Amino acid sequence: MRLVKASVSVNAVAELMVYEKRTCTTCKNLAALLEERGIDFDRVDFHVEPLGEEEIRELVGKTGRPAQELFRAREPVYAELGLGEREVGDDEAIALMAEHTELMQRPVVVRGDRAVLARPVERVNELLD
């Protein structure tokens, strides 16, 4: 996995890991917010360096939410696989996100043993309190 270190550390509040797609507007907005606040963070573009099932399972576990809540319902593959028409368990959802990176919502921000889907980007504050 390739990490990109953001060079911001003036008033580092927390060490954060941001799982993102660099071309995503929300991901760009999150990076700008963190940089403006002087918060140090690392970045992983999981569309360039795909995550494996175990990495996704760990992320899901840290959110405390069901895996299917990380699905991007607007992606064509979501409809093609009929994911909105049936129940999908965590194991299947994780396997599908590993196989189809575009299915996973972004950005996901991790701090220690907790993670949030930063949509809207202000949700990152849940990890900073």
Model regions and ranges:
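N-terminal amphipathic/basic-hydrophobic helices that include classical n-h-c signal peptides
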Residues: 1-12
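Low-complexity, intrinsically disordered/propeptide-like segments
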Residues: 4-6, 33-36, 86, 106
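Local sequence-structure signature of Cys/Sec-based thiol-disulfide redox active-site neighborhoods
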Residues: 12-37, 41-46
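Thiol/selenol-based redox catalytic cores and closely related redox-interacting motifs
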Residues: 48-129
